[in-house]
Amino acid sequence: ILDIPVIIEEQPFVEGKNLDVNQFYEKMANSEELLKTSQPNLADLDNFLMELGEKGYTHVIGLFLSSGISGFWANSQFLIEDHAKLKVAFPDTKITAAPMGAMVRNVLHWSEQGMSFENILKKLEEQVENTTAYILVDDLNHLVKGGRLSNGSAILGNLLSIKPILHFNAE
């Protein structure tokens, strides 16, 4: 629901507004620099929470990128007390990508089943603690662009067809 701008060669793009999926992958492949993201606008979240309260919602669960890779989760915590009409929870997902999407689907499913807010948060916490992800780095040049790997190591790794597998867990 909140836009996360992608910065490509110092120009901001937002998926679905001024960038589609095909353009994204093309720009990523052709970029000299690693693509960066900026945090969603905190004012947008504040406005969204106000709109939800005005529409009669009473409970809100927000799932954002892991606090380990984005400062948005920590910043979002300041808004919780500003919306006294809402019971708001922004748990740290400690993950991103597909596992976070699964969390969103599960929260929606549990809500549609009529599960209480507290039980949803408890089940979500269990899911967060038990979620791990493996990411295959198909192109070592992305690690070079991000400063995680030297050019020499990338050349050698590419010659040997090395594809690192990164493991993410709740820690």
Regions found by a protein language model. Name each.
Residues 1-3, 10-26:
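N-terminal glycine-rich anion-binding loops that anchor highly charged ligand groups
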Residues 1-11, 31-35, 50, 55, ...:
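Mixed-charge interfacial surface used for oligomerization/domain docking
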Residues 18-41:
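Phosphate/nucleotide-donor binding subsite
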Residues 40-52:
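A short, well-structured juxtamembrane/interface segment
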